[in-house]
């Protein structure tokens, strides 16, 4: 039948019979003539006789019996063969890396060997080399290629947005160096610069970079107008300012001189005959109220001169450095005296120290007395005028005290008339000096001259003890 021409050749029945005959005949063919290399799904064996085409008929697909699976496949190299093998490789390739892991794996682009036929196309034209990843089972470009760099850069861009939640370390204005700059924000087309906001690594919002011009400018116009009112601090010469507190430059010498002056003042008062006739409670009223102006007259008479230095509250770093310097002082040789610097005191001590204005009031009174060149008798009459003050609360013998004050002023006036030609001017100058005593606070004198000696003891207790003691 195969070598003869039939009138039914080309009909449907003829084709069915020929196909059935070939099905039964070709099953033994692969075992009899395995002369070519087999590719698993489309062997290289020769086609059966009479299958290339039919005489006078159209060309048909050339199917071959596979020597492994026993099925018919198109001949290798045809379009249908390439389509089938490509589809089959797509489904079967996830298991391929397990069989040929030839290099170190990088997770998304492993170093395994490329599949056969994927290096380049016929003709030498290079293609993108995709590799089957041994972890995710997908194809990725080879590490180091342009496509690989683009993909990994894009992946890092998406991952970086969630990174701020994993690494909080401080406020965004302290961590501007961690912020990631947003792309295409450098400048507009044409070279015109624009504000450079950066993605904050903590709050996830856009902020200007720290140390930039925008960062140093006020955040709003409201802050610009409010700032002067928000800090209504006193001027630098205000005595209430903590930086203008002062302390004695030589406290030991000055405090000893002031203590000696207080002792002489109490001795002068205690041994006055007109003062001794008063009851002890009335003596305490006079002394407790007048010891400060009496002391100032005594210090002026003794010409006590003192210097002060400004004090500053030390910062935490200064306290640490001072403590460390004191600990290592014994191991170091003595160094030359440094220049005078502001005295550092603790905040609890600084609030009790006198201010510059209060010390200037004390020095102003002393300078006034020294400029008048007051004599010893004038100082004694001035002390009596200050001591016998009838306006003090708690006095019971007011008439007696008032008479003592009037008598002291009369004696002072007679002395001035006898010693000075312009006695009225001299008397006015002495009264102006006494007027300055009103601006001197007794607590300031106690803190400045006596607190380092008596500690927490009050001056009222000191007056009682000195009156009862034998001076």
Curated annotation (Swiss-Prot):
Q: Write down the SMART domains for this protein, in alphabetical order.
A: HOLI (SM00430)
Where is this protein localized, as stated in its record?
Nucleus; Cytoplasm
**Motif stretch (LXXLL motif 2):** 80-84
User: Residue ranges for motif AF-2 motif?
Assistant: 462-467
For the region 4 X 67 AA tandem repeats, give the residue spans.
Answer: 1-253
Q: Which Pfam families match?
A: Hormone_recep, NR_Repeat
Q: Got a GO cellular component term for this one?
A: nucleus
Which residue ranges does the UniProt annotation give for the motif LXXLL motif 1? Answer: 13-17
CDD domains this protein is in? NR_LBD_Dax1
Annotated transmembrane regions: none
Among InterPro entries, the record links this protein to:
NHR-like_dom_sf, NR0B1/2, Nucl_hrmn_rcpt_lig-bd, Nuclear_hrmn_rcpt, Nuclear_receptor_repeat
- In its UniProt record, which GO terms are filed under biological process? adrenal gland development; gonad development; male gonad development; negative regulation of DNA-templated transcription; negative regulation of intracellular steroid hormone receptor signaling pathway; negative regulation of steroid biosynthetic process; negative regulation of transcription by RNA polymerase II; protein localization
Q: Where does this chain carry the motif LXXLL motif 3? A: 147-151
The UniProt record lists the keyword Signal: no
Output one GO MF annotation: RNA binding
Could you give the subunit structure recorded for this chain? Homodimer. Interacts with NR5A1, NR5A2, NR0B2 and with COPS2. Interacts with ESRRB; represses ESRRB activity at the GATA6 promoter.
Note on domains (UniProt): Homodimerization involved an interaction between amino and carboxy termini involving LXXLL motifs and steroid binding domain (AF-2 motif). Heterodimerizes with NR5A1 and NROB2 through its N-terminal LXXLL motifs.
Name this protein carries in UniProt: Nuclear receptor subfamily 0 group B member 1
Origin organism is: Sus scrofa (Pig)
User: Source taxonomy lineage?
Assistant: Eukaryota, Metazoa, Chordata, Craniata, Vertebrata
The gene that this protein is the product of is: NR0B1
């Amino acid at each position: 039948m195969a070598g003869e021409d039939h009138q039914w050749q080309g009909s449907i029945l003829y084709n069915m019979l020929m196909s059935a005959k070939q099905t039964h005949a070709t099953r033994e063919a692969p075992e009899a003539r395995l002369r070519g290399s087999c590719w698993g799904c489309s062997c290289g064996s020769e086609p059966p006789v009479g299958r290339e085409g039919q005489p006078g008929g159209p060309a048909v697909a050339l199917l071959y019996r596979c020597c492994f699976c026993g099925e018919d496949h198109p001949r290798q190299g045809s379009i249908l063969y390439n389509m089938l093998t490509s589809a089959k490789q797509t489904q079967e390739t996830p298991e391929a890396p397990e069989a040929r892991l030839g290099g170190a794996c990088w997770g998304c682009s492993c170093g395994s060997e490329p599949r056969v036929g994927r290096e380049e196309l016929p003709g030498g034209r290079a293609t993108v080399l995709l590799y089957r990843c041994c972890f995710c089972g997908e194809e990725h470009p080879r590490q180091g290629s342009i496509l690989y760099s683009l993909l990994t850069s894009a992946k890092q861009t998406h991952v970086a947005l969630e990174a701020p939640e994993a690494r909080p370390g401080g406020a965004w204005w302290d961590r501007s160096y961690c912020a990631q700059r947003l792309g295409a924000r450098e400048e507009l087309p044409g070279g015109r610069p624009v504000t450079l906001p950066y993605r904050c690594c903590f709050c996830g919002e856009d902020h200007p970079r720290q140390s930039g011009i925008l960062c140093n400018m006020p955040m709003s116009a409201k802050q610009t107008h409010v700032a002067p009112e928000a800090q209504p601090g006193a001027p630098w010469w205000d005595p209430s300012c903590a930086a203008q507190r002062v302390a004695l430059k030589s406290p030991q010498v000055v405090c000893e001189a002031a203590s000696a002056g207080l002792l002489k003042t109490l001795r002068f008062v205690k041994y006055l005959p007109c003062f001794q006739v008063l009851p002890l409670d009335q003596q305490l009223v006079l002394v407790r109220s007048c010891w400060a102006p009496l002391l100032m007259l005594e210090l002026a008479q003794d010409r006590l001169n003192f210097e002060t230095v400004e004090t500053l509250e030390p910062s935490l770093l200064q306290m640490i450095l001072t403590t460390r310097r004191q600990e290592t002082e014994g191991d170091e040789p003595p160094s030359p005296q440094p220049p005078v610097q502001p005295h550092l005191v603790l905040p609890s001590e600084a609030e009790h120290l006198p201010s510059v204005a209060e010390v200037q009031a004390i020095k102003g009174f002393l300078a006034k007395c020294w400029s008048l060149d007051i004599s010893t008798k004038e100082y004694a009459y001035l002390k009596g005028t200050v001591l016998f003050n009838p306006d003090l609360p708690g006095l019971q013998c007011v008439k007696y005290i008032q008479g003592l004050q009037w008598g002291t002023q009369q004696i002072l006036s007679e002395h001035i008339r006898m010693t000075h030609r312009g006695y009225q001017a001299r008397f006015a100058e002495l009264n102006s000096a006494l007027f300055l005593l009103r601006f001197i606070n007794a607590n300031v004198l106690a803190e400045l001259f006596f607190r380092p000696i008596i500690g927490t003891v009050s001056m009222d207790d000191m007056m009682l003890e000195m009156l009862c003691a034998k001076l």
